[in-house]
A protein has these predicted regions:
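Hydrophobic alpha-helical transmembrane segments of multi-pass integral membrane proteins
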Residues: 13-18, 56, 60, 101-105, ...
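Transmembrane-helix boundary motif in ABC transporter permease subunits
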Residues: 20, 24-25, 76-79, 103-135, ...
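Alpha-helical transmembrane segments of integral membrane proteins
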Residues: 12, 89, 93-126, 142, ...
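An internal, D/E-rich "acidic patch" concept
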Residues: 53-112
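Peri-membrane helix termini and adjoining interfacial loops of integral membrane proteins
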Residues: 152-165, 256-265
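Hydrophobic alpha-helical transmembrane segments of membrane transport/permease proteins
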Residues: 11-61, 157-178
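Membrane-water interface segments at the C-terminal ends of transmembrane alpha-helices
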Residues: 18-26, 51-54, 65, 133-161, ...
């Protein structure tokens, strides 16, 4: 476990360090953006509080020290006003995580039976039609689905709200209505990817000798599927789903702005366009941290789903 986590921690460290160094290359310096005019003592105090009183590496380690202690920096307004990034995260992050969880639930509920069906009908007409459709869906960016769904389903047909977000604590039914279109926008290409992965693994499992032997013993197709085929075949699917959690959080950047959902993706967009680079650095670091966490969790889960995975790691 430790051997797998340590390299991922270097990913977090490296990605945030590179971003921090890139911030030093901005045409407008960070000092010009965030330091309010004042006397020398006031300016020096502001520089020290933001870690801008040294070189690029001093700035990075000042930020990193604050980040690991839960201080994600500040959103700095013209004139020197500040708002802790944690205030925005406390509302935006749960919304994005809720969206990602919904997407994963929908994607897995659809892709697992779809992948099994196409695997058992491999080479037939229905398999070819579904496979070509899935390939096309996987090739289209999720924001294209978002725009199409918002325009046709939300605006022209008026079946669902094209914009806005209602918290589940206020009205759960309206919450579900406002989440359907953004969830579908992210879920459609995800379903395509998951289904194709599971289809390939199920086809490979069906060709294994132990499956042929189980069939020769008279075991039912249902028992063969759930006992001998689906369990080892789900390894790649679960791995992909876990790794995709971080990608989905990044994918919410455009989708949340299309549907006016006040999540982490929207906050990243706001930080970019309003040049709130301290907040942006913390947002990207959090996505990297979630990526590491999901990798660690899936590493443990795969050991239970497929013991061969654990044996290969311990070999």
């Amino acid at each position: 476990m430790l051997k797998r986590v340590v390299p991922l921690l270097f990913v977090v460290f490296g990605s945030t360090l590179i971003l921090s160094l890139l911030l030093q290359l901005l045409p407008v310096g960070l000092k010009d953006l965030y330091i309010a005019p004042g006397d020398e003592a006031s300016v020096n105090e502001q520089l020290k509080s933001l870690g801008l009183d040294g070189n690029a590496f001093t700035f990075y380690f000042h930020w990193l020290n604050d980040f690991v202690r839960g201080n994600f920096g500040y959103i700095i307004f013209p004139g020197g006003g500040r708002e802790p990034v944690s205030n925005r995260l406390s509302t935006a992050l749960p919304i994005s995580l809720r969206l990602v969880v919904y997407v994963q639930i929908v994607a897995l509920l659809v892709s697992i039976p779809l992948g099994i069906y196409t695997a058992y009908r491999a080479g037939r007409r229905s398999d070819r039609v579904i496979s070509y459709s899935l390939f096309a869906a996987a090739s289209i960016p999720n924001f294209v689905f978002g725009l199409l769904l918002a325009i046709f389903v939300g605006v022209q047909l008026g079946w669902l709200p094209p914009l806005g977000y209602v918290p589940p604590s206020e009205d759960f039914v309206e919450h579900i209505k406002t989440m359907i279109l953004p969830v579908l926008s992210l879920a459609i290409p995800t379903i395509a990817t998951y289904s194709r992965l599971l289809r390939s693994d199920v086809i490979a499992a069906l060709r294994e000798d132990y499956v042929t032997m189980a069939a020769s013993k008279g075991l039912s197709n249902r028992r063969i599927l759930f006992t001998h085929v689906l369990r080892p075949s789900s390894t790649t699917l679960f791995t992909s789903a876990a790794l995709n959690m971080g990608a989905l959080i990044g994918g919410t950047l455009v989708i949340e702005q299309i549907f006016a959902i006040p999540g982490l993706g929207s906050e990243i967009g706001i930080a970019i366009f309003s040049r709130q680079f301290f907040a942006l650095q913390s947002y990207i670091a959090l996505i990297a941290v979630f990526y590491v966490i999901f990798n660690g969790v899936i590493d443990v889960v795969l050991g239970f789903v497929d013991p061969r995975t654990r044996e290969r790691r311990n070999a």
